[in-house]
């Protein structure tokens, strides 16, 4: 039986960053003389160790749009604190009508995530996670909601510092 290739493409760069293209949209501008075609690309870039960035690019040709998106993703990378290849704690991210729930998982669970979320966790280096998305399935909104949730992630040390307690008291 033939295996269906996923829409997401990825590769490892010489600088150690992993790149994945999530979506390419063809857009049309109608002018008096006819139609002007263009392309919009959505990509994510990660280092496999908790850093992740999202980029959007627009151009008249697909490769140029993808390259612009990759460059923007590299510039906008943020660090997310991971714990043994999974998240620190359960977190919810929202953007527009998209809502995503992300929860840490035990070793051996794998990446249980759909669509654009899977690409994010693969380039980020997350190996065990359970996710659920609600509302909008638009790739742009899902990626933004996922990144919103990941930005809310905090380590036990950060929480302990905010509360004025020790890490042992926080972890119980």
Swiss-Prot record:
It comes from the Bacteria. PROSITE patterns: RIBOSOMAL_S5, S5_DSRBD. The keyword Transferase does not apply. One of its GO terms (biological process) is translation. GO terms for molecular function: rRNA binding; structural constituent of ribosome. Keywords: Ribonucleoprotein, Ribosomal protein, RNA-binding, rRNA-binding. InterPro entries: Ribosomal_Su5_D2-typ_SF, Ribosomal_uS5, Ribosomal_uS5_bac-type, Ribosomal_uS5_C, Ribosomal_uS5_N, Ribosomal_uS5_N_CS, Ribsml_uS5_D2-typ_fold_subgr. Residues 17-80 form the S5 DRBM domain. GO terms for cellular component: small ribosomal subunit. The keyword Ribonucleoprotein applies. The N-terminal domain interacts with the head of the 30S subunit; the C-terminal domain interacts with the body and contacts protein S4. The interaction surface between S4 and S5 is involved in control of translational fidelity. PANTHER family: MITOCHONDRIAL RIBOSOMAL PROTEIN S5. With S4 and S12 plays an important role in translational accuracy. Located at the back of the 30S subunit body where it stabilizes the conformation of the head with respect to the body. Part of the 30S ribosomal subunit. Contacts proteins S4 and S8. Belongs to the universal ribosomal protein uS5 family. HAMAP family: Ribosomal_uS5_B. This is Small ribosomal subunit protein uS5. The lineage of its organism: Bacteria, Pseudomonadati, Pseudomonadota, Betaproteobacteria, Burkholderiales. The gene is rpsE.
């Amino acid at each position: 039986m033939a295996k269906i290739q996923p829409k997401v493409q990825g590769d490892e760069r010489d600088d150690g960053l992993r790149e994945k293209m999530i979506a390419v949209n063809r857009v049309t501008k109608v002018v008096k003389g006819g139609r002007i075609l263009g392309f919009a690309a959505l990509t994510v870039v990660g280092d496999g160790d908790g850093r992740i960035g999202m980029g959007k690019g627009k151009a008249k040709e697909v490769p140029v749009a993808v390259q612009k998106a990759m460059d923007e993703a590299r510039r906008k990378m943020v660090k997310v604190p991971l714990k043994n290849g999974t998240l620190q704690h359960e977190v919810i991210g929202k953007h527009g009508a998209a809502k995503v729930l992300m929860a840490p998982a035990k070793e051996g669970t794998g990446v249980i995530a759909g669509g654009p979320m899977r690409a994010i966790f693969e380039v980020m280096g997350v190996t065990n996670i359970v996710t659920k998305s609600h509302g909008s399935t638009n790739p742009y909104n899902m990626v933004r909601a996922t990144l919103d949730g990941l930005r809310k992630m905090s380590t036990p040390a950060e929480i302990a510092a905010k509360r004025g307690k020790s890490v042992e008291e926080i972890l119980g």
